[in-house]
A protein has these predicted regions:
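Conserved catalytic or regulatory cores that recognize and/or transform ribose-phosphate-containing ligands
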Residues: 1-105
């Protein structure tokens, strides 16, 4: 089973896109460590945009890959601040429409 971790990137407070990406990647790494210790997620493979997208991808290309991975995952985990992120909202709506399990931080 797969669990897709959605965390805001563009909605972050850091001033440059590079800093936003670095901060979001650190956040995902921290979340993966926390989630891995949660018994609810013991059978899940954990993945996020940083597992399959290049840091220099266009936003459109990166989001298309993210949506693909939401569709092929069994569940989605929405991090703090997801409602302020267009990308996370798109991932949430995709998960909702396709009946995926949805977990919230």
């Amino acid at each position: 089973m797969k669990l897709y971790i959605a965390t805001p990137i563009n909605a972050r407070q850091e001033p440059t896109m590079r800093e936003k990406l670095v901060a979001a990647k650190r956040r995902v790494e921290m979340l993966k460590a926390i989630i891995a210790d949660d018994v609810r997620f013991k059978d899940y493979e954990l993945l996020s945009t940083f597992d399959f997208n290049d840091l220099y991808e266009t936003e459109e290309k990166a989001m298309s890959r993210c949506i693909y991975h939401v569709l092929t995952s069994d569940a989605i985990y929405l991090d703090h601040g997801w409602t302020a992120s267009k990308g996370c909202n798109l991932e949430y709506l995709t998960a909702q429409i396709y009946g995926k399990l949805i977990f919230y931080k």
